């Protein structure tokens, strides 16, 4: 079995000049795909997004494991209301840093790698052993991908 502990952090920005619905949907799809991958490998997956459900409820799942968790996670992802204002992603990252674990892999997914988010990711990298930044982009479009980040082509 795969004994990883993974935390997916997904930025769903709904209130900025960066907002494009297809990009936000790509970020949600990337989170779903990665969760599916890790859960099928047997990892324990936690998930947090700054997106909100139609009830304004924060979307957080802790320590999911097993194939059945994929359905629960996808249900929550499908509940993200892109018409609702999202919380500040950089602040969300900073809030988890005091409780971050060295043994956990953190995967941050954002369509807008702006300074405050990159600073928060860098701070998380200084506290956690493994942090991966993924930037979804539409194939053929020029997007500035920060050094060390991975592009997720859609």
Regions found by a protein language model. Give the residues of each.
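Exposed, interaction-prone extracellular/peripheral surfaces
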Residues: 1-154
């Amino acid at each position: 079995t795969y004994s990883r502990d993974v935390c997916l952090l997904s930025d769903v920005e709904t209130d900025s000049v960066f907002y494009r619905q297809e990009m936000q949907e790509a970020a949600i799809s990337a989170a779903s795909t990665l969760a599916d991958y890790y859960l099928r490998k047997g990892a324990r997956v936690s998930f947090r997004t700054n997106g909100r459900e139609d009830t304004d409820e924060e979307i957080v799942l802790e320590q999911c494991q097993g194939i059945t968790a994929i359905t629960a996670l996808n249900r929550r992802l499908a509940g993200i209301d892109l018409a609702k204002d999202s919380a500040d992603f950089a602040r969300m990252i900073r809030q988890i840093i005091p409780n971050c674990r060295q043994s956990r892999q953190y995967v941050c997914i954002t369509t807008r790698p702006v300074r405050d988010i990159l600073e928060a990711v860098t701070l998380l990298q200084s506290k956690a052993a493994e942090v991966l930044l993924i930037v979804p982009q539409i194939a053929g479009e020029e997007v500035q991908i920060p050094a060390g980040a991975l592009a997720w082509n859609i």
